[in-house]
């Protein structure tokens, strides 16, 4: 790499170009700009990240140091992780992309990479693990399976955050010498089209200190300057040696926050390890991470307008888990907390994030000198497994459960559990104020008929040629072609946080691209008052009414 002179603060604050892309492209963009070796193996929903990186290198696109990243496709995710491990030991800047079972195959190498304090970032489109059945859709089961590897873990909630956190994790890994899993929700974020601000090269360069690169190169294994690494240790030293990583993990939360602050100064987008939104005197707080936090923030904003004392806390840095920063972010008025996990750990007495929060607050109270004199009531819940919908009505049900005299702990929301009765009841027709200012559209098509591609182009045109914000999410099953696709599009003058589908009675525009759907689906049930319905049909204007189902 060629060292470059750091640009001035004024140059760094240059206007950022707005583009309309999905989460996978946002992560791949930063990864390609900040790495030299990219090991890939395809797995849904992370495959587009590797495909884009491969395409860009084939086109000769360069990273910020003027080199073209080398793309290596391996025989499996285990091979990709092994290649990353080898490349980083040789002093290269390296990354990979994966999800689900692919991440599980990387775990053996991840322990070594973390134990050797190697600055790698793995970008994960978080996806369900195969249990009673396989699912290609999103939850946090895979990243939670890797939480004990020693990798730091940074979560993104939106497409814009994917781009931003990809850069922040890359900088933090080099600065703090810990590898990162940067994860975001599979499909809900990885495949959502959204209008974002593109981070220009000068800001990426400003975030990556040349001294960190020189130090990383200096740790490369080379026969010219031999050192020993990766030995076999006996009981006399292994325990002591294992504890030597402690200072790096203790320092990492502060390092990440410092890099977030630097990023805010360059872009105007500010982040915290734990970001609170809500009433300053909130009594009920929901705590979670991932795309669901967007819908919770939208709902909290609505409830604040009705006088509710509620709030929400989104977790960004999950590992190392900083109890200090968590407690700083929580209002002192908090009395009831719902911790929502997007995973299930069978046999455990609670899901991972829930247990971390309970431990942090219990230790604070037990110290006698902490923020809370009495332990708030903390309830754990599961939501959104395999991309199950997480709507405003469900979020209100969680807040309602916090108010209940006989509150349900270790609950589920979003399903009807008639076996073990863990589920909360919710109102399916609940709406937020934010939805009233958004134009919502639905398009029904068949896989490979061009509907999804056309809608992506529509979103790009409106997002990039007007001042409006645009969001597109596309619902289809695991079949490659021929299945029904439903495109959910939203357009608004303000940022869109609705990380859930367009519901019945909400669509301002409905496009039916196959006449057979009229016999199969109640399409007009989705229409809002005064909605426009567009039918793609071979029938003439005179004959079309006779073709409609009676």
Feature-to-residue mapping (PLM):
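Conserved thiamine diphosphate
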Residues: 136-186, 210, 359, 366-384
């Amino acid at each position: 790499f060629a060292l470059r002179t750091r640009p001035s603060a004024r140059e760094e604050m240059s206007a950022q170009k707005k583009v309309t892309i999905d989460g996978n492209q946002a992560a791949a963009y930063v990864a390609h700009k900040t790495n030299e070796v990219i090991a890939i193996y395809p797995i849904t929903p992370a495959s587009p990240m590797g495909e884009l990186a491969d395409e860009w290198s084939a086109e000769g696109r360069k990273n910020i140091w003027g080199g073209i990243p080398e793309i290596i496709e391996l025989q499996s995710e285990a091979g990709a992780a092994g290649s990353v491990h080898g490349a980083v030991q040789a002093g290269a800047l390296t990354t990979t992309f994966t999800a689900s079972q692919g991440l599980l195959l990387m775990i053996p190498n991840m322990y070594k990479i973390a134990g050797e304090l190697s600055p790698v970032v793995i970008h994960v489109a978080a996806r369900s693990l195969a249990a009673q059945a396989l699912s290609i859709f999103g939850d946090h089961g895979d990243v939670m399976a890797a939480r004990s590897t020693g990798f730091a873990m940074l979560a993104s909630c939106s497409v814009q955050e994917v781009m931003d956190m990809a850069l922040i994790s890359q900088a933090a890994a080099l600065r703090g010498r810990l590898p990162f899993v940067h994860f975001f929700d599979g499909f809900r974020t990885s495949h959502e089209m959204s209008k974002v601000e593109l981070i220009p090269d000068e800001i990426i360069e400003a975030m990556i200190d040349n001294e960190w690169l020189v130090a990383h190169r200096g740790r490369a294994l080379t026969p010219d300057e031999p050192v020993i690494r990766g030995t076999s240790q006996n009981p006399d030293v292994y325990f002591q040696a294992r504890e030597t990583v402690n200072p790096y993990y203790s320092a990492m939360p502060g390092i990440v926050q410092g890099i977030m602050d630097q990023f805010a100064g360059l872009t105007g987008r500010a982040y915290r390890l734990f970001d609170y939104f809500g009433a300053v005197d909130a009594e009920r707080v929901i705590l979670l991470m991932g795309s669901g936090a967007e819908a919770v923030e939208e709902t909290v904003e609505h409830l604040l307008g009705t006088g509710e004392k509620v709030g929400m806390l989104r977790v960004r840095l999950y590992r190392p888990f900083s109890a200090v920063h968590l407690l700083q972010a929580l209002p002192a008025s908090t009395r009831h907390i719902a911790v929502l996990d997007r995973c299930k750990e069978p046999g455990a007495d609670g899901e991972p994030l829930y247990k971390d929060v309970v431990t942090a607050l219990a230790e604070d109270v037990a110290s006698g000198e902490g923020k809370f004199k009495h332990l708030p009531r903390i309830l754990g819940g599961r939501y959104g497994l395999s991309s199950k919908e997480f709507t405003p009505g469900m979020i209100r049900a969680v807040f309602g459960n916090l108010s209940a005299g006989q509150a349900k702990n270790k609950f589920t929301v979003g399903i009807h559990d008639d076996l073990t009765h863990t589920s909360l009841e919710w109102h399916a027709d609940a709406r937020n104020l934010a939805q009233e200012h958004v134009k919502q559209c639905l398009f029904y098509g068949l896989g490979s008929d061009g509907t999804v591609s056309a809608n992506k182009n529509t979103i790009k045109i409106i997002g990039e040629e007007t001042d409006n914000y645009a969001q597109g999410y596309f619902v289809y099953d695991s079949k490659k072609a021929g299945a029904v696709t439903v495109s959910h599009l939203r357009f608004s003058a303000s940022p869109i946080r609705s990380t859930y589908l367009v519901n019945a009675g909400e669509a301002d525009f409905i496009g039916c691209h196959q006449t057979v759907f009229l016999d199969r689906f109640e399409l007009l049930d989705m229409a809002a008052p005064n909605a426009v319905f567009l039918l793609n049909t071979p029938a003439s204007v005179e004959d079309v009414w006779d073709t409609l189902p009676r």
